[in-house]
């Protein structure tokens, strides 16, 4: 279970939100809504431990994330609004490098299969600098195909995707929820997640 208890966020001299509470269990997705500047990305950064809250506490499996360190990170998959890929590397090299840095096992065959699922068959060995923005986004999203960690934090995952890719990603997220995983995401798009319980939290 992921719990937020009485969270407060202050950036500069501006309070973005205060008294924020929620609980998220397996099979649930929390969709963060709100205008630009309402604190959605700041909340995601809090949930992954990069930004300490001004007040309140975040708990994972009943314990504060501040005390869990690597144990919490081992359960967490974070996908930011930036693609976080190396332009000089190929899609295949990017996937294998990301798995290595996360201390995860990912075979070359599984990485190629993931890239095929995101529509990059035949581009596995092309340097990412030659890909379109939508294709680069798909390289980043390919991580989710084989991802087994229970908690996904997704910042605008549908950016730069066409309609078919949006439907594909919604299916990947749905499968994660069906397996008992949970997710928190921000998106400006209307997306149908066919499985799991989708809850909405509006900021601002």
Curated annotation (Swiss-Prot):
Chief location bin: membrane
A matching Pfam family: ABC_tran
InterPro entries in the cross-refs: AAA+_ATPase, ABC_transporter-like_ATP-bd, ABC_transporter-like_CS, ABC_transptr_haem_export_CcmA, P-loop_NTPase
Record carries keyword DNA repair: no
EC number: 7.6.2.5
Keywords: ATP-binding, Cell inner membrane, Cell membrane, Cytochrome c-type biogenesis, Membrane, Nucleotide-binding, Translocase, Transport
NCBIfam families: ccmA (TIGR01189), PRK13538.1 (NF010061)
Protein's job: Part of the ABC transporter complex CcmAB involved in the biogenesis of c-type cytochromes; once thought to export heme, this seems not to be the case, but its exact role is uncertain. Responsible for energy coupling to the transport system.
Similarity comment: family membership: Belongs to the ABC transporter superfamily. CcmA exporter (TC 3.A.1.107) family.
Subunit and interaction comment: The complex is composed of two ATP-binding proteins (CcmA) and two transmembrane proteins (CcmB).
Protein name from the UniProt record: Cytochrome c biogenesis ATP-binding export protein CcmA
Organism: Dechloromonas aromatica (strain RCB)
